[in-house]
Amino acid sequence: MHQHIQVPPLEGKSRINYVNLPLINGDKLRTAKTLVDKAIKEKKVFSVQGPYPVIRAGLRARGWVERRLPRPSFSQPRRHDHETETTDEGDSSDEDDLGEEVERDDEAEDLYDLMSRLVRHETPYFYWTTRRDSVDCRSLRKEQMTNHYAKAGSFTTKVGLCMHLRNLQWFDAADPDTFFPRCYRLGAQDEKHAFIDDFRRTACTSLLLYVLEKYEGDSEGEKMGEVHNAKSHGLRKTRKQHSSQRIETSVIDSALHVCQEYLNSLEHCDIDNNLETNSTISEQQWKVFLQNYYLVVHEGINIEGCEYYLERCKCMLEQMRQVCPQMENDGICNIWIIKPGAKSRGRGIMCMNKLDDMLGLVDGDHCIMKDSKWVVQKYIERPLLVHDTKFDVRQWFLVTDWNPLTVWFYRECYLRFSTQPYSTHTLDSSVHLCNNSIQKHYQPSPDRSPSLPAECMWSCSQFRSWLAASGRAALWKAVVVPGMQKAVIQTLLTAQDSVEPRKASFELYGADFMLGRDLRPWLLEINASPTMAPSTGVTARLCPAVQEDTLRVVLDRRSERNTDTGGFQLIYKQAAVDVPQYVGVNLLIEGTSIRRPRAPVHKSLIQSHPEPLSKSTNHKSSLLSSPCTSGKENQSEEVKRACPNLPNRKITMDQSLIFHPKRKRPHRLVLPSTCCVLPNPTELHHPQRLSHTQPQSDRPHTHRTRSNLPTLYRPTPSVEVINIRPRQALTSSHYIHKIHTVNLSYPVLRMQQNHRRSKNTFAEREGPKSS
């Protein structure tokens, strides 16, 4: 212990306090060194941020030594005030956890202080922190453990939960609308318009339900034998009657029309409707309808002759219930809850029931609108009530691995009650928000049932006893618990690809549920770092047990697989997916060189040349020509002027080939005679006139250009004959004679060639034979 000795001040000098440092006991020092050496050898050094006396005590009992982190100065502005303005992932707070400090044992604390000083330069292998960003997971070794996963905001934030649950259809055959109230981001324009449509459609169904319940009463709840007969909550309040004012029945017709159009859209019947028959309600008509709806539901103004619409309203509501699983919770007041995504612990949450007020509130905050932080969610207007008081359920679950996904569900939970009786005619947070951080600022209302505790909490065992008194004890295990487990698993499946699956990490979460009148659980949100403050007698018993059982799962079970896990039970474990082994980057490009494409094979023996050919030497050896573009009017006129009208002609090519297979070199192709008779050029534009001529031979030929073949050097199409060869090899010299006849449209051109040439002349042209 530090001893402060006060010395009487001398004259003219101020008083000075002298501090005597305590003497270190040798036995205590040796004990500390022994424990520290063993902990360092076994890698059992931990660090805890915040009080958490249960975590510290549990780790010390297992032989761990704490390396204490520097404590923040309370004289400085608290860091969490800034952080919680930018995140809504958890509901834990250092201020709530201050009450966790247990009575100190001075002797033990001195030993722990000494051991902490001895390991001040050692590496902690276990981190337990309140906030995720207190430890950089990327800089941790693979054997270092921490109680947070990186990038878990995909389901622990209001925006992330709203977005990821929409992808549930890709992971499970389930509809998120069956366990999560429909939710929209008002910062996204498409979702904002979807919310407006949803609000208007809900107003229509609420109006029909109002008409039905006003004249028939809420007999459906009595038929179902519900725990609490919430008979027309929207009609309980005594409202001022406006006997002189009446609303026309056209408002009911509009509501029926909107509901029918919605049903048609689900059946895709609206696709066949023409634009002329499309009777979409205009914005002005919607404005008038909502004003009438507010007057009827909120002000109590009667609808003239609405009793004649009871059967139609009942029939339409039955059809809507089949396609809208949340219709039983919607009620008649059309209340929505607005949550600013940058705050947690119930701060900034408001309940509203008018569309213009909600849009005006969101549009006024441009910063939050820019980041899409505002979230609007349908309020559950008809929850299960205990003694006419609203409550929600806090349920813990633990994730120890994301690949494969491993989920542990805690067997016990607790209920948080409101301090005020439930009513939909007041939108005060003390009635509709059950967060302990909000309700602790209010005193229980004298109108609330005295059967409820003043600390506004029940354990799950107390709730089961209340259900048993109503004859519904079996529904806890048959409906409530399976529904909560299913909602947790399906939510984690949608976020699995977004979270970094670090093997040595784990995280404890707190899920908030509400129960419908049929005891079906509805997921509200999931909190990271749930508060462990012993604020009431219920949490003083449950929170330490949850922390101790968490250490059993994440530490004791690693060394002993069959160890007791306390209140945690394994509810889900995926099949393991093998991660490909990383062997480094080895980039290799394989392929072949690109070959030069071959020239296309020309099957036609006669081609047209639309442009004049040059007399240069290049054109003398060129036998290929471009296609004729005689389809153009200007070119056809030129052809008519250049060529007079001539009768139909034909071209006959008499070809002779001489082959000597016994010799080393084959003889060249010779053309004994060629006779060209060209037809009228005007008939080129009418190919059907030439159909009476002989068809061109379909015999395949292999074309190869030769310099000695005839070419018509004219400014008009020419004739080209290429490499005519026999089909089979000849055993001796044979003379082959072929005649090809084709139609042309030019004057007669006659070319004479010798039928045979002497061997000497042929040899001279071929040059000397190669040896």
From Swiss-Prot:
Entry's localization field: Cytoplasm, Cytoskeleton; Cell projection, Cilium; Cytoplasm, Cytoskeleton, Cilium axoneme; Cytoplasm, Cytoskeleton, Flagellum axoneme
- Where ATP binds, per the record, is at K339, R345, G346, Q377, K378, Y379, I380, K390, F391, D392, C434, N435, E525
Its Enzyme Commission number?
6.3.2.-
Alphabetical keyword list: ATP-binding, Cell projection, Cilium, Cytoplasm, Cytoskeleton, Flagellum, Ligase, Magnesium, Metal-binding, Microtubule, Nucleotide-binding
What the record says about disrupting the gene is: Shortening and loss of cilia in several organs, including the Kupffer's vesicle and olfactory placode.
Biological process annotations from GO: axoneme assembly; cilium assembly; cilium movement; flagellated sperm motility; protein polyglycylation; spermatogenesis
Q: What are the start and end residues of every segment in region (Disordered)?
A: 70-106, 605-640, 682-713
**First-level EC class:** ligase
- Look up the record and name the cofactor or cofactors this protein needs: Mg(2+)
Binding of Mg(2+) 1 occurs at: D512, E525
Q: Where is this site: Essential for specifying initiation versus elongation step of the polyglycylase activity?
A: R345
MF term (GO), any: protein-glycine ligase activity, initiating
* Pfam families attached to this UniProt entry: TTL (PF03133)
Q: Which domain of life is it from?
A: Eukaryota
**Mind telling me which PROSITE patterns this protein's record contains?**
TTL
Specify which residues bind Mg(2+) 2 according to the UniProt entry for this protein.
E525, N527
Entry binding sites for a protein: R345
Give me the Gene Ontology terms describing cellular component.
axoneme; cilium; microtubule; microtubule cytoskeleton; sperm flagellum
Q: Where is the composition biased (Acidic residues)?
A: 86-106
Feature: compositional bias, Polar residues = 614-633
The catalytic activity, as recorded, is: L-glutamyl-[protein] + glycine + ATP = glycyl-L-glutamyl-[protein] + ADP + phosphate + H(+)
What information about domains appears in the record's comments? Two conserved structural elements specific among monoglycylases, IS1 and IS2, are involved in glycyl chains initiation. Two conserved structural interfaces likely constitute the binding platforms for tubulin tail and microtubule. Arg-345 is the main determinant for regioselectivity, which segregates between initiases and elongases in all tubulin--tyrosine ligase family. A glutamine residue at this position is found in elongases TTLL6, TTLL9, TTLL11, TTLL13, TTLL10 and favors glutamate-chain elongation, whereas an arginine residue is found in initiases TTLL2, TTLL4, TTLL5, TTLL3, TTLL8 and favors initiation.
Instruction: Please explain the role this protein plays, according to its UniProt record.
Output: Monoglycylase which modifies alpha- and beta-tubulin, adding a single glycine on the gamma-carboxyl groups of specific glutamate residues to generate monoglycine side chains within the C-terminal tail of tubulin. Not involved in elongation step of the polyglycylation reaction. Preferentially glycylates a beta-tail peptide over the alpha-tail, although shifts its preference toward alpha-tail as beta-tail glutamylation increases. Competes with polyglutamylases for modification site on beta-tubulin substrate, thereby creating an anticorrelation between glycylation and glutamylation reactions.
The name this protein goes by in its record: Tubulin monoglycylase TTLL3
Q: Which organism is it from?
A: Danio rerio (Zebrafish)
Q: What gene does the UniProt entry assign to this protein? A: ttll3
